[in-house]
């Protein structure tokens, strides 16, 4: 098992948290730090570090009280900005929805939060997920974390409508993503 919390798999996070190897807050803080450090790659349209910490604190509190833990307690995720999340800007990467804050949860997000997951933020994508290069987002292209022979990576696209998901996973910015992949 890695000493870096952001290198752990979902199962390793879950099991390590349950075994007391680390707290859920430590996991959320590590992922929040990676999200902040990788801001230049533009994978997240909206960052929600407080949501990740809130879910982590709830998991730590439940564990301390001896309560049954939820399946995804302590696991931080990036949510594709295609899914509505109550009170959090949801744009589908479109200018038309730039100010939209849903008053409800999508079925996908509700199930994840009910399972104990914490949201690190909303992941960038092609506008309305209608693309294959992740270059049509109103909020700008996602920059690939890979470098071409040690050179500039700005011209590289992570590809797929879920480019933010692909980029953030490679850079240790979230352990799971919710969005289609090709």
Positions of PLM-derived features:
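An N-terminal boundary/leader segment
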Residues: 1-47, 51-54
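Hydrophobic side-chain positions on well-ordered alpha-helices
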Residues: 13-17, 62, 168
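Conserved hydrophobic/aromatic pocket- or pore-lining residues that grip, position, or stack substrates
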Residues: 31, 52, 80, 112, ...
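Enzymes and membrane/adaptor proteins characterized by extended Gly/Ser/Thr/Asp/Glu-rich
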Residues: 38-39, 71-108, 132
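Long amphipathic alpha-helix in the N-terminal Rossmann-like dinucleotide-binding domain
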Residues: 50-57, 116-117, 126
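Immediate post-signal peptide segment of exported/extracytoplasmic ligand-binding proteins
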Residues: 59-76
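Short glycine/serine-rich loop segments
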Residues: 104-182
């Amino acid at each position: 098992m890695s000493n870096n919390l952001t290198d752990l798999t979902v199962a390793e996070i879950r099991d390590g948290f349950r075994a007391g190897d680390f707290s859920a807050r430590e996991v959320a803080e590590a992922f929040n730090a990676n999200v902040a450090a990788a801001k230049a790659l533009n994978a997240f349209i909206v960052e929600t570090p407080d949501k990740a910490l809130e879910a982590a604190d709830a998991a730590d509190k439940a564990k301390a009280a001896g309560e049954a833990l939820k399946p995804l307690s302590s696991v931080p995720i990036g949510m594709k900005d295609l899914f509505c999340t109550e009170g959090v800007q949801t744009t589908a990467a479109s200018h038309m929805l730039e100010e939209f804050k849903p008053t409800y949860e999508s079925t996908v997000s509700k199930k994840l939060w009910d399972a104990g997951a914490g949201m690190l933020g909303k992941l960038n994508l092609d506008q309305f997920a209608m693309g294959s290069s992740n270059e049509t987002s109103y909020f700008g292209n996602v920059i690939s974390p890979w470098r071409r022979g040690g050179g500039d990576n700005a011209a590289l696209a992570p590809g797929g409508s879920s480019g933010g998901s692909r980029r953030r996973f490679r850079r240790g910015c979230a352990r799971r993503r919710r969005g289609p992949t090709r």
